[in-house]
Structure formats: C-alpha cells, structure tokens
UniProtKB/Swiss-Prot annotation:
Signal peptide range in chain numbering: 1-18
Glycan attachment positions: N356, N451
Tissue: Highly expressed in mammary tissues from mature virgins and at day 13 of pregnancy, and at lower level during lactation. Expressed at intermediate level in liver. Expressed at lower level in kidney, heart and brain.
One Pfam family of this chain: GH3_C
Keyword Lipid biosynthesis included in the entry's annotation: no
Name of the gene encoding the protein in the UniProt record: Ghdc
Protein name: GH3 domain-containing protein
Coiled coil regions, renumbered to chain: none
GO cellular component, one term: nuclear envelope
Family according to the record: Belongs to the GH3 family.
Location, primary (coarse class): endoplasmic reticulum
Length: 532
C-alpha cells in the first residue's frame, strides 16, 4: 500500500516538474537534469507498467470471472435507464434482454440512423492504459536504446499511443512532445534530428501521406531548415535532406535517420496495405510496432509481441466487455449465439461484439479475428477482415481479404508498380453500369507506373476469378462485368482521407481506412483525379 501511495505521489509531481522544465529552452537545461528527468520518468513508467502487467496476468488466468466482473461493472456504470438487473445478471439473461445490434463498419455510411459506438477513442478504459504502459516497456525491451532522450519523434498531431499522458513526452525527452501541432512543424522537428531511433505516426496511412508529402515538398522543407525556421540555421542538415531525397523513396527513412530502428503506428482496419508500401519503399529494413488494435469501440486488443511481424493481439477480459460471434466456415454468415473468450477455438474465426457502460448495447463491430494462440486463458488473435468492407453487386460476397490478395497479385504482374492505396466502388454508386452488367470500379494509387494498359487492367479481373469461384461463375454467365481499374494522381487518397475526416460526425472515431466507398460524392472525388 505504501508503494502505491508513493507511486501516486510521483504521478502528481512529475507533470508539474515537466511543465516547469518545459518553460526553459531545450539548450538551457543541463545534461544532468535531462538525465535525471528521464530516469525518474522511466522509474515511474516501470512501476506503473509492472502494476498493469500484474493486473493483466491475474485477469487472464481466470477469464470467466474477469469477464463476469467486467459485465457487472458495465451494468453498474450504465448511463440512463437499464432494462437489466444490476446484480447477479448471468450471460443468458444478458443475451436475452440485449439483442445484437449493428454499428458502423466504416467511417462513412449511407444512412445517418446508425447506432453509436460503445466507446470513444482516444481512448477510454483499462485496455488503453495497459496498451500504452505495457507497449512502451515492451518496445524498450526489444530496442533498449530506442527511447533514450531525443530519440523519438511523432510526425502526426495525434500519437499512436492510445492513452494520452500529457507529461510523458516531455519526461522522456521526445523531439516532439504530445500536444496539437501543425503537421509541417512536426515533420520539420523530426527532420532536424538525425539521431532518431523511433518514428511515430498515429496510423500507417497517415505516415504514408507524410512521406508522399515529404517527397513533393522536399525542396521547400530543405530551404526552411537552412533558413532556421525552427530557431537555428542548419544548412548542412538541409543539404543532407536534399541528397537523401535525390536518391528516391527506397530506404529514405534510413538515409534521413541512420540510427532509426522501429516505426510505431496504431493498427486499425485498412492499414495493412500502407504498412506493406512503407516496408517496401520509404521504411525499408525497419521494424514496425503497434501497441494496440483500435476499432469502432476504441482499443479492443493489446500487442505484447513486437517481434511478431504478422500482428498478434491479445483480447483482454476487462472493459469493454467482449463477446465472440462465430463465423460459419466458408461464408460470412454468423452463428446464432455469441461465445465468451474462454470458448474461443484455435484457427476459428469470430466477429467481435462489444458492450460498454457508455452505451449499454451489444454492438457487432464487423471486425473479424482468427484465433492463433492463447495467453493464459485468453485468446491471441489476428485481425483478418471487416464485414462492412465487402463487395456485392449480384449476391456474391467478395470480402476485404479476398479482394486485397487478388489486387496484390495483379499489381505484382504490372512491371515496376508498387501499390500505395486503393478503394473499391460498386458500379451502382457511380451509375456506371448503364447498358452493361454491374461491376467493381477500382481506384488505385501507384508508385513506379504512370499509365495502365488494357492488358494490365484485365489482370485484376483474372486474379479475382482465380480467388473467388463465386465471382468467376458470375463472370462466366455475364451477370457481373469485368472490374474496371482507374489510376489516380499522387496524393488523391490524402484528399480522400481529409474528406472522410470532415464528413465524420465525431472526431473521436477510430482511424480506420475504408476499402469500399458507398457515398457518391466521395467516389466522385477520386473519379475527378483519375489520370489513366
């Protein structure tokens, strides 16, 4: 108990010290003070992380009891009226009184009468705090020098760490401490710091936008650095930036920051494509780490294994309360009843169902996971697809994974092409099927290819037929027309993401990237930027 009180006292004192130290310029602080600040911060962080690790281990050793406690907590804290008794509610009563409901599968919906998400990121709940504290400790163990003072920079206004700890960035001596800043200023701060070991961005797609923008505005940024826009004239660093950019995108991050070890982004739906592009081009040779997986209900899974490249996540038994809805093998139909975490079976696929006290609703997220292992009694999963990102023009179901694999195979047959981004639109959205069979309209942004031949366009349709027997049958009968591929100019998807953010009714939505667009004005936004 005494140790807990000491920890709480430190938690109160360090933010105050960080604010006081922040008032002094970076150059005015003596080295011993910076070192002391860093040691105190890591001491606190280690204590807090050890406490969270103990709580996580205890809860995952008795998952049934932990989930029952989480459910009781949600019922007690539920806002407004509740149709359930607050005490002694078993799972059968819970399921009978609260039917499953749908939540938004993407950031844009045709109907505005959608149910609210059960929680709002950035991000509430034990899972968010655990993801941040345990993620930092895990990252430091994997890369011991990565979080030394001045070794980390975030190039987006929002951090990838789910739980915002205002003093942490200052206490750990980050180049870009937490707090809303202009993205250009954040990038400049990172560029003038050649000793970076960790590069952070909220999501992979946002980091992709940063690198595309860096290439486009590199000359202007170099001039700003040389002119000392951040307070110090740095002509040598400006020359290094120009030289690095002249060598092209492949390996650019390592040329800018020779000591760089790892890229930290927050994983969510639709990020895998951006990660793949970053790995092949700008961030070649670097490790990637995501502390958590964020969905419509906030943080739903923790990453305790930075060494695993596939992205394995632990489903914790706390709040939000998680149920698993089995997916029937070979289809995207769901079973009649949900399961608890203890009932999950290895290699099986499930849709996540979340309940939180904010909105006492059993929300089907649409995020599908496959169980790949266990941590104590809790399932370790891999996120496979989102049910809301399926294509269907004639009753077929082409899910996100099937389409992405087919597209990757097709792009692999386009000489010199690297896929940066894509979205699909069903032809009815653009009224482009008049006089022809309904089909898929596919918009892609590429690197290394400026024009698409008809032969290359046809390869996507061939790959789709190989990937889906149902699609092949419909194509053979003429019920579905060939997929049409459109190449858009660089930066088009950044414009799309800005439009999605403006269209979103809440700034707290998770940073998902839709792969199927169902609103005409968003599809037309890309249509206007087609170059081939």
């Amino acid at each position: 108990m005494l140790l807990l009180w000491l920890l709480l006292l430190l938690l109160l004192l360090v933010p105050l010290l960080a604010i006081l130290w922040q008032q002094r310029s970076r150059g005015a602080r003596p080295c011993w003070l910076i070192s002391l600040q860093h040691r105190v911060a890591w001491g606190m962080l280690g204590w807090a992380a050890a406490w969270q690790q103990w709580r996580l281990d205890r809860s995952t050793l008795n998952v049934g009891q932990s989930q029952q406690q989480a459910l009781m907590w949600c019922l007690k804290k539920a806002q407004g009226s509740c149709c359930l008794p607050r005490e002694d509610t078993d799972m059968r009563t819970f399921r009978n009184h609260l039917p499953l409901t749908q939540t938004s599968h993407t950031q844009e919906q045709e109907s505005e009468e959608t149910l609210p998400s059960p929680a709002s990121p950035q991000y509430h709940g034990d899972a968010s705090l655990q993801a941040t504290l345990l993620g930092l400790i895990t990252l430091n163990k994997a890369y011991p020098e990565a979080l030394a003072p001045g070794s980390t920079a975030c190039v987006t206004p929002t951090s990838p760490w789910p739980c915002s700890v205002p003093w942490l960035g200052h206490a750990l001596g980050r180049v870009s401490p937490d707090g809303a800043k202009d993205p250009r200023t954040l990038l400049l701060e990172a560029l003038i710091s050649p000793g970076l070991r960790v590069l952070e961005a909220r999501t992979a797609v946002e980091l992709l936008d940063v690198f595309v923008g860096l290439e486009a505005d590199g000359e202007e940024l170099a001039e700003a650095i040389a002119a000392g826009i951040l307070g110090t004239l740095l002509p040598k660093r400006a020359a290094e930036l120009k030289e690095a950019l002249e060598q092209g995108p492949r390996g650019l991050a390592r040329r800018l920051w020779p000591k760089l070890q790892v890229v930290v982004t927050l994983d969510s739906g639709g990020q895998a494509e951006a990660v793949a592009a970053l790995r092949v081009l700008w961030c070649q040779g670097l490790a990637f780490f995501s502390p958590a997986y964020a969905a419509s209900g906030g943080v739903v899974a923790l990453n305790l294994w930075p060494e695993r490249p596939q992205g394995s996540y632990l489903l914790p038994p706390g709040v939000p309360f998680i149920e698993l809805l089995p997916i029937k093998e070979g289809t995207q139909e769901e079973a009649a009843s949900t399961l608890l975490l203890t009932d999950a079976q290895r290699e099986k696929e499930y849709e996540l169902v979340l309940t939180n006290h904010t909105s006492l609703t059993r929300c089907r997220l649409g995020d599908v996971v496959q169980v790949v292992g266990t941590y104590n009694q809790c399932p370790v999963v891999r996120f496979t697809c989102r049910l809301g990102q399926t294509l269907n023009v004639r009753g077929e179901v082409t899910d996100e994974t099937v389409f992405s694999v087919a597209l990757a195979q097709a792009v692999g047959q386009w000489p010199g092409a690297k896929l940066l981004d894509h979205v699909c639109v069903e032809s009815r959205v653009l009224d482009s099927c008049e006089g022809s069979a309904p089909h898929y309209e596919v918009f892609v942004e590429l690197r290394g290819l400026r024009n698409l031949s008809e032969e290359n366009r046809d390869k996507l349709d061939n790959c789709l037929q190989e990937a889906s027997a149902q699609y092949k049958s419909l194509r053979f009968r003429g019920s579905v027309g060939p997929a049409k591929v459109h190449l858009v100019r660089p930066g088009s998807f950044r414009v799309l993401r800005e439009a999605l953010a403006a269209f979103s009714s809440s700034s707290c939505r998770p940073p998902e990237m839709p792969r199927v667009i169902r609103l005409r004005h968003l599809a037309q936004l890309l249509q206007k930027r087609v170059i081939s």
